[in-house]
Amino acid sequence: MLRSISIASRAAGPVRPVARARTAVGVVAPPRVCCCAPAVGNYGQVDGKATLNSLRRLPAGYRPRSCPSSRSPDVKKVLVVGSGGLSIGQAGEFDYSGSQAIKALRESNIETILINPNIATIQTSHHLASEIYFLPVTADYVAYVLEKERPDGILLTFGGQSALNVGIQLEKMGVLERLGVQVLGTPIRTLEISEDRDLFVQALNEIDIPAAQSTAVSTIQDALDAAKTIGYPIILRSAFSLGGLGSFPHDEEELRNLAAKSLSLSPQVLIEKSLKGWKEVEYEVVRDAADNTIICCNMENFDPLGTHTGDSIVVAPSQTLTDEYHMLRSAAIKIVRHVGVVGECNVQYALDPNSRDYRVIEMNARLSRSSALASKATGYPLAYTAAKIALGHTLRELPNAVTKSTTACFEPSLDYIVTKIPKWDLAKFQHVERNVGSAMKSVGEVMAIGRTFEESLQKAIRQVDPNFAGFEAYWKPEDMITALTNNNDRRLFAIAHAMLNLDYSVDYLHDLTKIDKWFLYKLENIVAVHKQLRSTPFEQLDKELVMTAKKTGFSDLQIAQLTGKTEAEVRTLRKQFGVTPFVKRIDTLAAEFPAYTNYLYTSYNATTHDVKFDNGTMVLGSGVYRIGSSVEFDWCAVTCSRAIRDLGKKTIMINYNPETVSTDFDEADRLYFEELGFERVMDIYDLEGASGVVVSVGGQLPQNIALRLKKAGVQVLGTDPEMIDSAEDRHKFSSILDSIGVDQPAWTEASSLASAKEFANRVGYPVLIRPSYVLSGAAMNVVWDEAQLEHNLTLATNVSPDHPVVISQFIDNAQEIDVDAVAHKGKLLVHAVSEHVENAGVHSGDATLVLPPFSVNQHDLGRLKTIAEKVAQAFQISGPFNMQIIRKPPTGEEDAELKVIECNLRASRSFPFVSKVLGHNFIDTASAAIMDTNVPAPIDLMAQKRDYVAIKVPQFSWTRLPGADPFLGVEMASTGEVASFGKDIYDAYWAALLSVNGMKLPKANSGILLGGDITRPEMTEVAKNLINLGFSLYTYDPKVEAHINDQPYLSIKKILVPVKDKKKLREILEEHEIQTVINMARSRAATTLDEDYAARRAAVDFGIPLINNPKLAVLFTETLEKKFVKNNPIPYSEGFKPSEVGSWRDFVGEAATTKLEGIAWTGEAYCIILIPGIGV
């Protein structure tokens, strides 16, 4: 725990320790015009304004200028730049930070404009910002919005690396100065210094802060030369990039390939001396324009340096630091003051475990992933406070929004320990490298709170995956030494195996892993209790041992597995002993001052409750972000919680994801930062005496325990869990569809391999393997022959051994349609029909969705509505549901075939998309249906004509997953989504495509690499479109070469694609100026020696756009044809506005159907009004 803290204020004199959670004394009033500390040099007073008067070792390009005023009374309109689609390295934490920033602006009566194409986020809901632009977060498009809206200020530090890079570009373009837009908070020059590694090291040298020996380079040869000078081992780090794009090359050839890859994605890389094995420590710092500075939180990585902090287990506060804590704290304050941060930032250190020697790794002068973790770990509203500081407020005048009883100038103090564990989904990808290093690979993270490290860690392990009971030996590698020495996504379980089964000592494990012995001794405590439980018969368990186990973080299921009993039997015994958890409050002050927060957790290391209980309605959140469940389910959970509160009912949110808005302090009457498993939900339900539980807005995780909750006597609100179970079980679901006359593909229950083969031969290949109770298509596969059938059927049954596996006919070349809907007691209230661009066979989460649908006629829309009505009635649905339907186009006068392939009796990932596109909040309607209160009348949104189109495009993170095959199939692979509006499908797709992080359009006369299945009818059409646009076509496949060259007026050249030599492959792509890869392969590569695989992988490795679906390739080329001028995209120019540049209100406007509280700007203050026709 932290023993003492202080508030640093230059005005108050030298830094001195004070009692924790107390403000500094002697803080004097700021000067008439307050200023931030300079990036370099000292400020002096001239005519009441602070100016730079000492130029000592200025970084190149720095221009002395007056310091900005601490207050901005003229700022009445501010543009907030969002982060775009979720990707590895830049995820949902920016929805949280951006949402808090917008709330802070609203409180200050400032009109807020938001640009963010991530339609799944809370911040893009229209009760927050007054205008929202679903446009690319690029300098050009932000400039278009600035031209149109003419704001007074811009906030760049709440949209991650994307927003920061855009701000720097806008400054260089001169747009901000020309339009008179003030950068609020941290100035651009400070952002540049923090991002340019060379300038940052220069700044650190000026104040005698040590940094790792490094050289900034922008070419491959310079990287090789720098490495020779510094000497291996080295680390290669990218500047201006998110999520630590870097790695540890061991020799010249590895460095050459890594530098080429990094320089294709970032303009500069840093070659540093490797400090692998040192401790890694972070400090979150807040500073205002009057130079008041506090440390919000310090965190320590469980894993030593060498693993990206986003992929590390992290604890807060630090546990193994002594005097080093104050040394690094003072250095962080010194750095932040020197470079001139105004707002929030984090400083990362490498600390020698055997001395007080340290190095600064980096500084993020913006809200970051660590900021979100620190904010949730301490209860301190970092993003809210940073936004207020950006408007000129000081820490000492800002109230703490959480405690209501202190100011923001109080440093948080913790009487608990927080553990963060990353969530990797590497097992979903074929050929992926599972090692974990300096390049981030995790897709999400969990945060657990306990009173001991053991309790906190075991909680966090269960939060990562419900299949994990705790610190157990889930991985038993054959080569233990390699598994422990080289970090990977399963090393924690290898350590458990080493300690539980192989009796490795703490000293030996420390030598292998370099993990601090303090942490290893804590793991040894868990192992000791584990062994005691394993050796004690259930009948001999006493209260003392059960209490010890619970205090050490063991779950009921874990104890049951060790004693040979069921979870229910352990729960019954535990309650008989009176061993139940206590509810504790996070007050940010370690209980030193009265503070009545609603931010709660449970612990067995306590003796009293901190709260009284009041029968609220529980809403189960989505848990950790992972592929298949991301920010869209947080939007659903938050929206539902707000709707229930609007009905006058108290809400209880349960979630453990620090990146979410649902875990914000003001989104529910009570927030439990807790597990979403059966045991903990039941504990909270019993303690609170809750009036009911909502399980249908948090994705698959809450659904999986719905039936158990009902059987335990819980009042599950909305659709009956028995019906949920029937829809989740493919066999039961198909039987119900048969009974109501809704068509579906032919199917059978695969009870044996022989019966599966017989079915496949009867209906014909391809067939689809579908296990029950899975999310994002885990283990689903299209099977094209008998050999694949054997392999995939085995894989599927391993995923869900307790549920039957369904094998169904796969309809090739069919269209897929999503139907999102809400019903009440079996009656359909509202529905939306979205059309996939890709044919069936691509997971709906990876598909490109179009709304309103572009090729479904009114007759088929009516038939789809009828199917939705039948399904709602059959399952007696009360709440949200989603269906995926196959549409086989007719061959003659008959109707198109419509076959239901899946139905989820919960909100889907497309609910935010359809709600915002149609202007009707589906979750508000669903919440009314769930609560059976104020249920609206049915409405047919699809019968209304609209003069706009919206397209949702997936965001992939292939670059972060070395070796993974970038192929689209029935198993989901995307990490996020973006969406844009347009007057037609081409405008919308153009904007959505450019919204994808890292998307670079091909230039005129460049090369396109074409490959894949020549039987695809789209291949010839795509080739014709590209040649008409002036592109040169290349292929590596002789079949493609022959096929294209046989067509009139088309030509393609065959080139070599080396499948083993990355260096040679890169040179060939550069030689032929390949700027896009289009691959139409029918199936995933069997090996890494496949040329299609090599081409796809090369595209993502070297930052080349990849189009890997035939239908998508047609839309891509048609869009280029519509949007290119002289075979090139139109660059930004003053006074020009592309047709897709419009706000949500510009496009949706009066098409919105739900009356909802909106925000209007009167010129003096925000007014909360009812806007006719405005929803979402």
Curated annotation (Swiss-Prot):
Uppermost EC category: ligase
Region (Carboxyphosphate synthetic domain) location: 70-465
Keyword Transport: no
Cofactor note: Binds 4 Mg(2+) or Mn(2+) ions per subunit.
GO biological process, one term: L-arginine biosynthetic process
Residues given in the record as ATP 1 binding sites: R197, R237, G243, G244, K273, L275, E280, G306, T307, H308, Q348, E362
Subcellular location: Mitochondrion
Chemical reaction(s) catalysed: hydrogencarbonate + L-glutamine + 2 ATP + H2O = carbamoyl phosphate + L-glutamate + 2 ADP + phosphate + 2 H(+)
Residues that hold Mn(2+) 2 according to the record: E362, N364
Purpose of the protein: Large subunit of the arginine-specific carbamoyl phosphate synthase (CPSase). CPSase catalyzes the formation of carbamoyl phosphate from the ammonia moiety of glutamine, hydrogencarbonate, and phosphate donated by ATP, constituting the first step of 2 biosynthetic pathways, one leading to arginine and/or urea and the other to pyrimidine nucleotides.
Name listed for the protein in its UniProt record: Carbamoyl phosphate synthase arginine-specific large chain
Organism this protein belongs to: Cutaneotrichosporon cutaneum (Yeast)
